[in-house]
Amino acid sequence: MSPQTETKTSVGFKAGVKDYKLTYYTPDYETKPTDILAAFRVTPQPGVPPEEAGAAVAAESSTGTWTTVWTDGLTSLDRYKGRCYHIERVFGEKDQYIAYVAYPLDLFEEGSVTNMFTSIVGNVFGFKALRALRLEDLRIPPAYTKTFQGPPHGIQVERDKLNKYGRPLLGCTIKPKLGLSAKNYGRAVYECLRGGLDFTKDDENVNSQPFMRWRDRFLFCAEAIYKSQAETGEIKGHYLNATAGTCEEMLRRACFAKELGVPIIMHDYLTGGFTANTSLAHFCRENGLLLHIHRAMHAVIDRQKNHGIHFRVLAKALRLSGGDHIHAGTVVGKLEGEREITLGFVDLLRDNFVEKDRSRGIYFTQDWVSLPGVLPVASGGIHVWHMPALTDIFGDDSVLQFGGGTLGHPWGNAPGAVANRVALEACVQARNEGLNLAQDGNSIIRQASKWSPELAAACEVWKEIQFNFKSVDTLDLNEIK
C-alpha cells in the first residue's frame, strides 16, 4: 500500500450522500491547456440550484456517483474528477444556464471518439436532477487531437486528386433514393456526371436491399464513372455507401470499391457508429480513397435547443474520427440551419485555428494543430436560384449537392446537371469580377440563362420554390449582443 493510500484510508471512511457542489463545483479552478472543456446548457429541476446542477453534470460525466463510496480513498479524485468551473445564466430563457466543465485528459483513451463521448455524454443526460441538458460545445486540446489521424486526406489532397481548383465542387444525390435497379441507377449516375457534375451520391439509406444489391450497384456506378470521365476529360466520382450491418461487411465493401479503382466511398457515421467510422477512415487513408460522410440521424440528437448535442460538437467529433466531406445544412434550403451558427461549425470543419466567437455559437477557441480539414456539403432542397447564395455562404471549399435540383429538370438528368454547372461557373466568374453575389445573384443567373437553355428551363421550373420556415436552433440573446 502506498503512503498516499495509507494516509487516505487512515482518515476513515464516512458513508452517506453529500451535495455534488461540495466536491465538483470549483469556481476558482484555472483550466489547463490539456483539459477537455465542455459547455453544457443546463435546465435544472425546480428547487435545484444551478451550482448543484452544474456540479452534478461534472460528477456524473467523470468520477462521481450518487453516494460516497469507500474506494474513493484508493485514488486521487482531485486528479481525475471533472470540475464545473463557471456558470452563466442564459438570457431570454427561464431557468437555463451554461455550465462550463473541465475534464483532465487522463480520463480519455487516446484516439477514441467513442470513449470521449461515452464519458462526457454517455450517462448524465438521464439524470433526474435535470429537466434537460444539451452539450453546446467542446474544446479539444492539441494534446488529445494529436492522438487522432482525422480525415483520410483533407481538402488540399482531395483537390490535388481531382485536379479541380478555384470553385465549389458539384454533386447530386440520385433519386428516387430507393427502388431503382442497379442498371437504371448507374444510368442516372452517368447522365449526371456527363452533364458536368463532379460527384453523384448514394442516399444515406441505400445499402444492400433486395431491389439493388450493393455489389451490382458498385459495378454499374464504376462503369458510369469511367464512361463519363472518358467523355468529359474530368475526374468523376460517386459516393458508394459502404455502410453495413457489421464492420467486417463494411470493410469488405470498401475493399471492393478499392479494387474497382473508384476515388471515393461513403459512410453514415452516426448510425454506423464512431468505432466503425474511425476504422473506415484509417482504411481510406491507407488505400487512397476519399471518404464522404452523411449525418443521418443527427437531427434526433441536435435539433432541440434545450436537450441533446449541438451539431458543432458532432462536427468536431467527425473531424477527429475521420471524413473528407460531411453534410452541414444549406441555410437556404429545406433543412434546419441558421446562417451564423452554420458558418461557425463550417469554419470548425475547415480551418486550422478558430477563435471563440459567441455571435456564431463558438464557445471555445479551437486549435486543430494541422489536422486535415473537412469539406462541408450543402444539400437539401436547393436549386439553381440558390447557387449565388450558396457560393457566397460556403465559398470555394465546399460541395454543393443538388438532388431534386438536378434530377427534377424537365428535360432530364444530364440537362439538370448542365444547368447547375452553368449556374455555378457564372457565379464564380461574377464573384471573381467583383460582383456581390448576395445582391446581384438573381441577375447573374438570369444573364447566364440567356445563353444556356438548360439553365433557363431550370429557372422557370423552380422560380417560386421557397422554404420559409424559422430555425428551431437559434442563437441566444446574450450571444447576439
Curated annotation (Swiss-Prot):
Primary localisation category: plastid
Pfam families membership: RuBisCO_large, RuBisCO_large_N
Reactions mediated catalytically: 2 (2R)-3-phosphoglycerate + 2 H(+) = D-ribulose 1,5-bisphosphate + CO2 + H2O; D-ribulose 1,5-bisphosphate + O2 = 2-phosphoglycolate + (2R)-3-phosphoglycerate + 2 H(+)
Name of the featured protein: Ribulose bisphosphate carboxylase large chain
Cross-referenced Gene3D superfamilies: Ribulose bisphosphate carboxylase, large subunit, C-terminal domain, RuBisCO large subunit, N-terminal domain
Record PTM: The disulfide bond which can form in the large chain dimeric partners within the hexadecamer appears to be associated with oxidative stress and protein turnover.
Cofactor binding annotation: Binds 1 Mg(2+) ion per subunit.
PTM-bearing positions, type N6-carboxylysine: 201
Xref: InterPro entries: RuBisCO (IPR033966), RuBisCo_large_chain_AS (IPR020878), RuBisCO_lsu_C (IPR000685), RuBisCO_lsu_C_sf (IPR036376), RuBisCO_lsu_fd_N (IPR017443), RuBisCO_lsu_N_sf (IPR036422), RuBisCO_lsuI (IPR020888)
